[in-house]
Amino acid sequence: MITIPYLTAVSTYFSYGLLFAFGQLRDYSRLIFDWWRTNNLQGYAPICLAHEDFYIRRLYHRIQDCFGRPISSAPDAWIDVVERVSDDNNKTLKRTTKTSRCLNLGSYNYLGFGSFDEYCTPRVIESLKKFSASTCSSRVDAGTTSVHAELEDCVAKYVGQPAAVIFGMGYATNSAIIPVLIGKGGLIISDSLNHTSIVNGARGSGATIRVFQHNTPGHLEKVLKEQIAEGQPRTHRPWKKIIVVVEGIYSMEGEICHLPEIVSICKKYKAYVYLDEAHSIGAIGKTGRGVCELLGVDTSDVDIMMGTFTKSFGSCGGYIAGSKDLIQYLKHQCPAHLYATSISTPSATQIISAIKVILGEDGSNRGAQKLARIRENSNFFRAELQKMGFEVLGDNDSPVMPIMLYNPAKIPAFSRECLRENLAVVVVGFPATPLLLARARICISASHSREDLIKALQVISKAGDLTGIKYFPAAPKKQEVEKNGIKLD
């Protein structure tokens, strides 16, 4: 729950209203004075919806230089950001040959495997020489190598499940798997802030979807009670299947799932638990095994475990882990396994090598050091931001920490000021977040040194002063929320 002070809420609404008014005025002026330049195809339906087209032209274009900044280096603690210029008021951006060396607080490179690694990289290169860059085939044709089989065994062992299946894309893991698991006559109960891949997968399943308040087990139980009592729409027959979908760490909030309570409720009402560990696997827990290890939840109590290899493991793709019967069923039914090209062998080798480093099977203790460092870095950075007076979302141990901006004018102001000081940050606004809840999302890595973090804090503090986003008094004992505020989920 985020509480916005009234003054901040009013100024944010006013800013959006001003942008909307000027956008409408410009459209009206163009209709009158530049009518011959319009390119309306008679008889064709518009490709873009009117409100989406307006948002892109009149709001997004003003600040699009703050998004999708290209880089020309590995996503390490420091990256080379390619400079871009525009000669048409930001409508189009042209890349230049100049780069800026920036401290990287935007990548999901939690354990630092995204750049050269003394153990992983040589094995990836050797795999590339032996297997090439692609299998050029799906898993059921000629796209399964010994490395793919080894990776599935490695993942199953690592996450504590009997079996696993891997996919070439993390997003597609959710969006393609959920429709295979459940369909018409089934019920999906989803956290209100679940990732888009989960939302799209649920919509594509044909199942009935109900949403519970973000990370609130009490409301989840209320929804379960109501839906079980009511049954299917119109017929009121019992649900064929109920799946509760949650995330380990919520990527836009940095909050850790209340998994023990959710698992207990699902057991009580005989609902399956689907856990998305995209941002938690490898990043939290004593040995990097995610939210189950951190919170002491037995992995046998989680029916479907999903995760990606793009964050902590420095590769690509995703996985589903569960019972042997479940995995065998998915291998025979899931389109992402049957028809999509399998994950490249070098990418699979990178994941296997990273897991071996994490578990100490490379003959060193670098994995344990990385896990200790990501936790120490995350908690240090979060505490320092809060002392400065920023409104920071999320929980301790989480490497994801959003800083609330709220006002749309502060999105480009904060982003550009940080870039000017050679700090690369990610800013997020509508429609990725609710209209009033724009934020900067900080991602901490084990590859960051203490000096890196101190420099980042100095830059963020300066940018926060200039943009007015320090919503709390400096160095508070505890972040207190204003009594009079507007509460938003």
Swiss-Prot record:
Primary residence: endoplasmic reticulum
Gene3D superfamilies: Aspartate Aminotransferase, domain 1, Type I PLP-dependent aspartate aminotransferase-like (Major domain)
Cofactor(s) listed: pyridoxal 5'-phosphate
Knockout or disruption consequences: No visible phenotype. Lcb2a and lcb2b double mutant is not viable due to pollen lethality.
GO molecular function: pyridoxal phosphate binding; serine C-palmitoyltransferase activity
Tissue localization of expression: Ubiquitous with the highest expression in flowers.
Family annotation (CDD domains): KBL_like (cd06454)
Residue numbers bearing the N6-(pyridoxal phosphate)lysine modification: K311
Claim: Cytoplasm is one of the keywords in the record: no
Transmembrane parts of this sequence: 2-22
PROSITE patterns for the chain: AA_TRANSFER_CLASS_2
Keyword Lipid metabolism: yes
Membrane topology designation: Single-pass membrane protein
Keyword list, A-Z: Acyltransferase, Endoplasmic reticulum, Lipid metabolism, Membrane, Pyridoxal phosphate, Sphingolipid metabolism, Transferase, Transmembrane, Transmembrane helix
GO annotations of cellular component type: endoplasmic reticulum membrane
SUPFAM superfamilies: PLP-dependent transferases (SSF53383)
Pfam families registered for this protein in UniProt: Aminotran_1_2
Location in or out of the cell: Endoplasmic reticulum membrane
Pathway membership: Lipid metabolism; sphingolipid metabolism
Family, similarity comment: Belongs to the class-II pyridoxal-phosphate-dependent aminotransferase family.
UniProt-listed PANTHER family: CLASS II AMINOTRANSFERASE/8-AMINO-7-OXONONANOATE SYNTHASE, LD36009P
Function per UniProt: Serine palmitoyltransferase (SPT). The heterodimer formed with LCB1 constitutes the catalytic core. Plays an important role during male gametogenesis and embryogenesis.
Descriptive protein name: Long chain base biosynthesis protein 2b
Protein's organism: Arabidopsis thaliana
Gene that encodes it: LCB2b
